[in-house]
Each structure stands twice: as C-alpha cells, then as structure tokens.
C-alpha cells in the first residue's frame, strides 16, 4: 500500500443546471468508491426508467435521495482518489441545507470547485445578479475556503461545439467576478470540460486541441496540467491545527451503563488525551478524561478531524450537553461568551433587519437565539471597507459589523483563533437568512465552576 494518501475535502458549487451532479458523479464513478455491481444496478434502473442518457448524475441523485431521507449511506460513495489525495465531497448544493451545512459543517472544505455551464445562454443565467453561483462563491470565500478551481462545463454544447472563443469569453467573465469576491484568478485553475462526455475530466480531450492546459501561480508553488483531476491533485494540502489549544464541540452526551457519562464530538483543534483535565463551557464544569475512544477502540490521543467519545468521571448527563465545548483546563480553556462582534452578510431576508432582531444562530453544534444588539457599520462585502456608521437597518445583500448577545449561555470563539467555532448561520423562517464570522468575543469572567473530585486529584498528582 505504501504511505496513506492525505485526505482533503472539496465542496462543489455552481448554478442548478451547470452540470454539477454529472461532473461530480463522473469523478466518483471513474475514480471512486462505487463498486461495479452498484453501477450496473444503477444503469439498469436508469435504462428501465428511460433515463439512458443519465449515467453520472443518476449516481448522485440516488445518493442524494438516500441522504435526504436520512438513510445513512456508505459514505465511501462520496469519495474518490487522485494520485495524491483521498477526496471527500462534503456537500453538493441543491441539498436543502447546503448553506447551513457549509457553515456548521462537520468539516471545512479545503477547496471549492465552481462549475459553470458554457452552453448558449446557460452561463449568463447562472452568473446573473440572482444566480446562486455568486452566493455560493461568496459564501465559500467568506467561510475561509481560499482555494478555487473552475470547471467550464458542457463544452460539447457550445456553438459551435468545443468553441475556444466561448471558453475564453467565459474565463474572462468569471475571472472578473471571482476577483470581486476576493479570489486571485492567477491562483485558480480554469479547465474546459464535459462532465457528460468526459472531456478533460481524467484524460486530455482530443476535441479541444487549442487548449494548452491550465496554470496557477502562487507563492506556495506553481502548478500546471490539463485535466480537472490534475487540478484537484494540485490543491495545497491543509494544515491540521494540532498546535492550537483543544476545542471539541459536543454533538451528544451519552450515559452508558457500567461506564458512566460519555460526551461525543469532533476534535476541531488541539489534541485530546486520557488523563487530561478538561473544562466544558459555557457550563463551567471541569473534570478528568478517563479514556478516549474512536470506533470502539481506545486511543492514546485524538487529533483534529477525529470523531470521538470520551469517558469523564463525576459528571452527570445533566451537567453537560450538545453545543457545549470541551477544552484543556490549563491551556486557554473555553469560556462563556457574554457577547461578540461579527461580520455578517445578509443573504435572503424579505424585509429589513434592525437592532433588536433575535433569530437563531447555528454555530458549531450550538443552536441558540442571539440578538443583534447594535449595527455598528455597513461595509463593502469584498474589501471590508466601511461604507457607513451605525446603519438603521440591513437588507439582503448587505454586509455589516454587528454586536450580538446570546439569549442563553453559549461558547463561541473568534474565527481567526478557532475557525470552526467562529462561523455561523443565522436561521429564521426555516431558511438561512445570513452568515457570519466572529471577529472578537467578550468572554464572561467565570466564577467558581464545578470542579470534580477526579479533576482535583489529577491536578494534585501533576
């Protein structure tokens, strides 16, 4: 086998009909975790339903339907391999909760793949003022997904087919627009593809002899290639934040007979080890970690990205709950936030938002109503430059710096310190109204919290 490949996460964005599903399906189909039997089954079903032309998108539709129904599907279906990486597609838009997932998502995407359709009139529709493409790309950028690849899809349906002129026109247009969002087009690979026919997906296409390949220039090393697969291979690998203090938002807390209380969650930053004394915020409970488990195996340490359960002593299920955050009691322990300052972008709100508005915030695993206490300034979405002080209200499309106050105790962090705990979605009327990143947190001075006997013992022993 040799050394295991690095895992990376990508998010696929673009307009409804850009051919995202077909393109993604093609990659999974050709390089992925779907076995031949499943594919043959899908092909047979598709043919019976007269969807013979389907193939790749069908694969994805099947997976999506299962995912939406809450069936836990074999997650390997959403994975594929390049020569360097194991790639997981963490979400494909079109899924109802796409925006929310992208923010509170279990993982941060390392790269966004933007698919635009080159067909006559299609590109224009996708990129128009109200096309979703803009929103998705802006969202990816705001949430810290700094690498981008652009697939110019459906090259087989341009006029004439595989038109170099049309491709260049689109590249020019998309470059201008991603630049407005904040991406530097020089660092972005543009690839003319057909997710349907397979042009430039895994093999260089014979239909576009004019395409001399893509190039990216960046300080971490330049790269070039011809296909979409090669572009994915040139994503810069993520650095996992093991050197930061521990932050582990709880997804659940179980009471297990004969074992005791077992909080479960994903290590976002730092390292969790047995014997560590951890503090849970905002409840301010401190205790010793007796053991750490993943997939029923004891671990000597858990690293960022690991979903683990850990056994704690002298803590009842009533003391800690979902949305609490565990950290090292001796190294920048997590604390309750009295309030915080955030940069928000209003995505879709039918009216206007003014001070006092109190929607629900989804931040990591916490789900808590927060009040927009003060609208401090309206800013330019892209540059962050101030446009006006103390605006009276905000509407869709606006970006602003606001002060927020949680309605119940919660633990959040600034995006620059702990990214997964510093981005949030604002939910109201069953949709994502706004997204935000936290600039600064006003931490509440913790009184004497509950320190369990086992924690005191462990601290003395040290």
Curated annotation (Swiss-Prot):
Give the UniProt subcellular location, in the record's own words. Cytoplasm
Pfam families linked to this entry: GTP-eEF1A_C (PF22594), GTP_EFTU (PF00009), GTP_EFTU_D2 (PF03144)
Which of the residues bear the PTM N,N,N-trimethylglycine? Answer: 2
A GO cellular component annotation here is: extracellular space
| Species whose genome carries this gene | Homo sapiens
**What coarse category fits the chief subcellular location reported for this protein?**
cytoplasm
Record lineage: Eukaryota, Metazoa, Chordata, Craniata, Vertebrata
**Which named protein is this?**
Putative elongation factor 1-alpha-like 3
Describe its function: This protein promotes the GTP-dependent binding of aminoacyl-tRNA to the A-site of ribosomes during protein biosynthesis.
Modified residues annotated as N6-succinyllysine in this record: 392
Q: Which residues carry this modification: N6,N6-dimethyllysine?
A: 55, 165
